[in-house]
Amino acid sequence: PAKCAASIEACQPLAKKVIAWFQPHGYGPTKFLRNDFVEEISKALRPEDEIWMSEIFYAGGTAVKDISANDLINDLKEKGVQAFFVENRTDLVAALRPHFTEDCVLLLMGARDPGLEQFAKTVWEQL
């Protein structure tokens, strides 16, 4: 959570608006870090900034799928944050388009998903 917040804060001097996307990794870690994530992100975002999430990356195994990235989005909304959920990340650019401004930064964050690099390239191509 602190690294995500620091990444957002590092982008803020570059533009009037930061649109940050994060794909949580693992159901257990997401559940464990839920409150910390919500607290860190809500403190880092300015009123004009946005946080977007897609569903948790599942690497397989016997994980109990008892949390969703949308749960974190709802927690953030309760704190007054502009927070949005796009279940499938392939739908992200289409959903983001109306939110782009002349002076904004798009920050993509995630971990452990081997497809993230290709996803970032695809986002770049779609912009």
Summary of predicted features, one role per range:
Residues 1-127:
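ATP-dependent carboxylate-amine ligase
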